[in-house]
Amino acid sequence: MDFSRPSFSPWRWLTLVASLLTCGICQASGQIFISPDSLLGVEKYRTILTLENVPEDVLEYSWYRGKDNSTENMIFSYKPPNTRHPGPSYSGRENVTRAGSLVVRMSAVNDTGYYTVEVDTSNETQRATGWLQIVKLRSNPGISANTSALVEGMDSVVAKCLTNSSNISWYVNFVPTSGSNRMTISPDGKTLIIHRVSRYDHTLQCAIEDVPEILQKSELIQLTVAYGPDYVSLWTQPYFFAGVLTADIGSSVQLECNCFSKPEPRYHWIHNGSFLSIPENNMTLPSLSWEQMGSYRCVVENPETQLTFYRDVTIQPPRPPLPTVNRELYIPGPLVIFLILLTSLGGAFVCRVLVYSLFQSCSRGKTCHKCPWQTN
C-alpha cells in the first residue's frame, strides 16, 4: 500500500518476509506465532497483535518490546484467569486478552518495532517475535464539482475526488455507487459524472480505503436541483365542476393553486384576459359582483426550469329557474255554454247536409229505386 509516509526500508521488507516464512514454519510445526495480518497498524486506531497456535495449558503470557525477553523490555504479563502485571515498558495503553493477544490502544507511529511474546506451559516455554509497523493515514480526500446548481433532466454534474490514492469509492445520497446508465465513474475512480441529474440527487461524497476497513471520507457537496412544476392543481370554494364554478352574487369565492416545484414558483392570476396584481397562489373574492364574473386563469412559472403551467376556471351565476307550467285546464262558464250551442248547431248543420246529399243522389239516378221514405 502507498501510505503518506516514507516507505519501508529494504531490510524491514526482508524482515517482514522472514517473519511470514517463519510463521508458516511455526504453523506447520505447531509453534505459536503472531498473525501476519495483525502486524500492520494505523495511527490513532487500536492494534491487536493476534497470537496463533496457542496451546491449551498456558500458565502465563508475557509480552516484550524488542527481540528479547529481558525484564526491562516487558510490557505486560497475564496469568489466566485474572492475574495481570504491567512491566517497565508498559505505557498505559496495552493489555493482554484471554487468548494471549496484545492490544495497543491509540497506536502511535513510535509503537513501530519488534514485539516478542513468551508463552509458558506446564511442559515448555514457546516464544515468537514479529515486526509491527504503525502507519500514518494520509489526509482525507478533497472533493470538487463543476457546479452545484442544476436543472433536473437537463444538466450534468462532474465531481472530482482530490487524492493520490487508487482505492476510491463514491457515495450519492450517502449510498455507495459503482456507476449506472445515469452515472459514469472514470477508470482511475477519481471522477464521477451524473448525467441528467434528478431531484433526488442531494449529496456527493468520495472516500479512500488505503487500510482495510478504514474508510476516509471527503466533505459533502450539497446539490441544489431545480425541478417542476410537474402539474398544477386548483382548489376552489365553492367547488367547481368541469371548469365551471357556480356562485351567487354577494357570496364569497376562494381560489387556490398548488404545485410541486423548486425553487418556489411565481404565481400570476388572469381575469378575462387581464393580469391581476396578485402574486400569491390564492385569491379571495369576499363579495362576488357582476364585474368579477367570468374566466380566471392561475399561471405557475419556475424561472430556473423555465416551465410554465396553468389552470382555468369560469365563475358564473346560477341559472334562473324555468317557468312553472300549469297542467290543469280551466274553461269559464260562458265559454262552456257557447261551446255547447256551437256543437249543437254544428251537429244539426251536418245532419242537414247529409240528408240533402242523400236526396240529391237518389233523384239523379237513371233507374230510380225507391227511397226508404217512399211508400207504395
Curated annotation (Swiss-Prot):
Belongs to the immunoglobulin superfamily. CEA family. Its main location: membrane. CDD domains: IgV_CEACAM_D1. It is a single-pass type I membrane protein. SMART domains: IG, IGc2. The keyword Zinc-finger does not apply. It is found in: Membrane. The chain crosses the membrane at residues 331-351. This is Cell adhesion molecule CEACAM18. Disulfide bonds join 257-298. Residues 31-330 are extracellular. Residues 1-30 form the signal peptide. InterPro entries: Ig-like_dom, Ig-like_dom_sf, Ig-like_fold, Ig_sub, Ig_sub2, Ig_V-set, IgSF_CEA-related. The keyword Protein biosynthesis does not apply. The lineage of its organism: Eukaryota, Metazoa, Chordata, Craniata, Vertebrata. Mostly expressed in the small and large intestine and at lower levels also in other organs. Glycans are attached at residues 69, 95, 110. It comes from Mus musculus (Mouse). Keywords: Disulfide bond, Glycoprotein, Immunoglobulin domain, Membrane, Signal, Transmembrane, Transmembrane helix. The gene is Ceacam18. Residues 229-314 form the Ig-like C2-type domain. PROSITE patterns: IG_LIKE (PS50835). It comes from the Eukaryota. GO terms for cellular component: membrane.
